[in-house]
């Protein structure tokens, strides 16, 4: 989880804004709790909700009980002291922003997203994902910042984003555990 520390460092040193969607279950050690506190102290960072459990990576069962998803979100608010109403659902590119909505191709998150929206949560998906060069890579080498930048510009130019002239990029903190990949984040 050194990636969280590296992300926070880049937000501070480069004076850029970022929103981090946190999973409460992951904040169980002294170091991880400190990373959460460091994000809270950073004026460039916004903390948002990515559920307490991350569905324990059992998404079909998780989304089959919308009320359970809602309770998991509420638990994360308490555990991490999250005040934002922004949520990203685990493993689903689902959006609920005001009257606008977009559903993930895997439709099983729709009832949960609708319930959360009804309770004044704003659900964010993503427009673009920064992935590893190869999912099977042992080095976890990331796509180059230039390739990511080109993808961002293309999506904005072609209006291939959820909201015009606004892009949400999905990254995971473990991508930046090593300093080499953290430097790629800085370059972007």
What is each PLM-predicted segment?
Residues 1-6:
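Boundary/entry segment of secreted carbohydrate-active catalytic domains
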């Amino acid at each position: 989880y050194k990636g969280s520390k590296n992300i926070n460092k880049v937000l501070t040193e480069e004076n850029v804004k970022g929103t981090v969607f946190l999973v409460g279950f992951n904040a169980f050690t002294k170091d991880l709790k400190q990373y959460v506190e460091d994000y809270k102290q950073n004026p460039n960072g916004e903390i948002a909700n990515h559920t307490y459990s991350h569905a324990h990576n059992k998404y079909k069962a998780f989304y089959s009980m919308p009320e359970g998803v809602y309770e998991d979100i509420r638990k994360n608010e308490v555990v991490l002291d999250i005040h934002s109403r922004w949520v990203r659902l685990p493993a689903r590119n689902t959006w609920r922003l005001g009257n606008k909505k977009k559903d993930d191709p895997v439709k099983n998150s729709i009832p949960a997203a609708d319930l959360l929206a009804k309770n004044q949560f704003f659900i964010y998906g993503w427009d673009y994902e920064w992935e590893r060069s190869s999912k099977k890579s042992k080095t976890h080498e990331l796509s180059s910042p230039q390739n990511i930048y080109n993808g961002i510009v293309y999506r904005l130019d072609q209006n291939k984003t959820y909201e015009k002239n606004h892009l949400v990029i999905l990254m995971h903190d473990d991508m930046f555990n090593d300093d080499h990949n953290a430097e790629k984040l800085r370059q972007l």
